[in-house]
Amino acid sequence: MSSYFVNSFCGRYPNGPDYQLHNYGDHSSVSEQYRDSATMHSSRYGYGYNGMDLSISRPASNHFNASERSRSYSAAAATTAAAAGPEAGADTRYNQPATSSPSPDPLPCSAVVSPSAGDNHHGIKNSIASPTTSSNSSSSSSHISRDGVGTSPGTEDDTPASSDPPSSQNGQSTAQQQPQIYPWMRKLHISHDSMGGPEGKRARTAYTRYQTLELEKEFHFNRYLTRRRRIEIAHALCLTERQIKIWFQNRRMKWKKDNKLKSMSMAAAGGGYRP
């Protein structure tokens, strides 16, 4: 609530401590920090700077639903005023009989949200307690929290908190079922899985044109590779040492076969030729 709206009521209503406190004796016995109307926290206790109750003018979207409870409070106050008379009707808002509702909080600036209901969830931090107020507050069913806001064990606000653990467990189970795939876990070569034959047989590796060209160039200069050279080629072509070794073995076998056929053809051609 803005200070502009609160200050507009300063000249119309008397000071807050001038009203008589019910069941708590004279207001002079209360601490000075609660008698001073300028130091009261309007947003927490529902009062303005002059001690006036502004809970009726609050919007319906606040945390305590003051608009609905204020209407029921006004109806109860009108009934009490009609029964007590015109003289007592002026102060019925601030002087309620003890039988209509449980005793309010021991602060003069605390707002009575719903006197007809027994579950008054309005907590106050560092409240001043007296022997009389302690006996009255023990019989009431109000729950006071340390943070300054009353909480109920069975409200709708507890359902999101109770539903958080299952959602977090579902997220963890989903993360466990779907492990993250890193780039080095993927296959770097194209393999014909359908042409692999039996399941126990290793799939045949299909080399790219660039890889085949580089391997052919290396085989042209040297048909046998050292361990260091094999590692260099494997890193350069993104292959493994085993693939390089097998490719060179197959290439040598092919080279020997070609040379053997070539020599045999040359021998046959030379034997049949008679100068």
UniProtKB/Swiss-Prot annotation:
Pfam families in the record:
Homeodomain
Q: Where is this region: Disordered?
A: 84-177
- Superkingdom is Eukaryota
List where in the cell it is found: Nucleus
PROSITE patterns found in the cross-reference section:
ANTENNAPEDIA (PS00032), HOMEOBOX_1 (PS00027), HOMEOBOX_2 (PS50071)
GO cellular component terms attached to this protein's record: nucleus
Q: Where is the composition biased (Polar residues)?
A: 93-102
Give an example GO biological process. Answer: anterior/posterior pattern specification
* UniProt-listed InterPro entries: Antp_homeobox, HD, HD_metazoa, Homeobox_antennapedia, Homeobox_Antennapedia_CS, Homeobox_CS, Homeodomain-like_sf
Annotation: DNA-binding region? 200-259
Q: Report the function annotation for this chain.
A: Sequence-specific transcription factor which is part of a developmental regulatory system that provides cells with specific positional identities on the anterior-posterior axis.
State the family named in the UniProt similarity comment for this chain: Belongs to the Antp homeobox family.
This protein is called: Homeobox protein Hox-A5
